[in-house]
Amino acid sequence: MPKAIDAIGKSAMKTFMKRDDKAIVLTSKEDIRNVFPVGGKDWVSKLTPADVKGAKVEDKGGEYQITLTFGTEVNPSDEKGYAAAFGVLTADVVNFDYPGLSLTDQKFTYYNGTIVARFSKTTGNLVYAHYDYPVIIELTAHLLGSNTRVKVGMTTINDFSVKY
């Protein structure tokens, strides 16, 4: 049975975990809200000082660069920690539709996330943002009476150039 679960896992990874370097241009507020940076929210960040492990501000000539670093957090939710600034995975999102397969005991461990944001000195506007947040996904896969604990790592990297 582990071979069947392995095959399903590989299929799911091939389907959902892809490198996508295509640039997209978002112009409407609705399009931007669906993608940047926490899809479906009408806010960009709800970070508090307690959510951030470290912060650095650098003068980059015509821009200021702010780098925020994050520690380790398990199952972020309620718009705190990683969920205050990143589109995090939850159990209802990681649920593949395969006949006879069910997933339980999902655990999402985020670690060493970073946000790098650059702001124009002239306007104060955000001109670029880079989001990088690794996660270890652990879950139990149930298939035809077999239970297999699965662990996989992935990193989400998003780059946004902002034009006004």
Regions found by a protein language model. Name each.
Residues 1-164:
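Subset-of-secretome marker
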